């Protein structure tokens, strides 16, 4: 957390004022398994990156946004996970971290809306990245069997297509919106 302010200062000295932050910090549970066996060090590791890192990075960027007049639209975009709202007891630390990051996004949205800064949350589902490599084999058949109504893994470009209108202000009145990017995975089914 101590490195956040110097990092943002360095970025702004090189690139100019930040108008959009996409907070995409995320690490999986170090050890998947029974939540009753989670060790404090593993819990802290996941929450330090997935929650504390995202929160304090957004806080510093928001402070800097508020410290200068705006000529461009400004936005904070939190990339959390469908796990913010879909519990998995074998990855409880991850789910807890993403649920807390979701609440942080909502709090920032309420705080920054009067200042004209949009805050959004994206909840990716099963996205084909390095982070999903270890779960790919066990989810292929489940996806083919209907777990994801769209019938496929999400791609990083699916996230990008949602981020762009948020960053450009095309969704400014939707501040605080939670947008699932999961091919229908999180749709409740009966």
Task: Kindly label every feature range from the protein language model.
Residues 19, 36-55, 77, 101, ...:
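Catalytic Tyr-X3-Lys loop
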Residues 4, 32-35, 39-44, 144:
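Substrate-binding pocket helix/loop in short-chain dehydrogenase/reductase
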Residues 63, 110-111, 172:
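Alpha-helical segment proximal to the catalytic Tyr-Lys
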Residues 73, 113, 118, 174-176:
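Short, small/polar-rich loop/turn modules that mediate ligand/substrate recognition or access, typified
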Residues 32, 164, 175-190:
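Short C-terminal tail/terminal secondary-structure segment
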Residues 58, 97, 105:
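Active-site helix of classical SDR
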Residues 81:
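Residue(s) in the substrate-gating loop at a strand-loop-helix junction
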Residues 148-159:
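A conserved structural motif in NAD(P)-dependent oxidoreductases
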């Amino acid at each position: 957390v101590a490195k956040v302010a110097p990092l943002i200062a360095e970025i702004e000295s090189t690139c100019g004022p930040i108008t959009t932050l996409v907070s995409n910090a995320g690490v999986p549970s170090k050890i998947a398994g029974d939540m009753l066996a989670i060790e404090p060090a593993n819990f802290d590791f996941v929450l330090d990156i997935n929650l504390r890192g995202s929160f304090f990075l957004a806080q510093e960027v928001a402070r800097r946004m508020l410290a200068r007049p705006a000529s461009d639209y400004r936005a904070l975009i939190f990339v959390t996970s469908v796990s913010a709202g879909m519990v998995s007891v074998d990855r409880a630390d991850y789910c807890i971290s993403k649920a807390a990051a979701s609440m942080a996004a909502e709090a920032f949205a309420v705080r920054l809306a009067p200042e004209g800064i949009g805050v959004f949350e994206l909840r990716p589902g099963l996205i084909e990245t390095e982070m999903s490599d270890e779960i790919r084999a066990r989810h292929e058949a489940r996806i083919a069997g209907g777990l994801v109504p769209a019938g496929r893994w999400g791609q990083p470009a699916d996230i990008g297509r949602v981020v762009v209108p948020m960053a450009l202000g095309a969704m400014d009145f939707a501040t605080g919106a939670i947008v699932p990017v999961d091919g229908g995975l999180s749709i409740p089914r009966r």
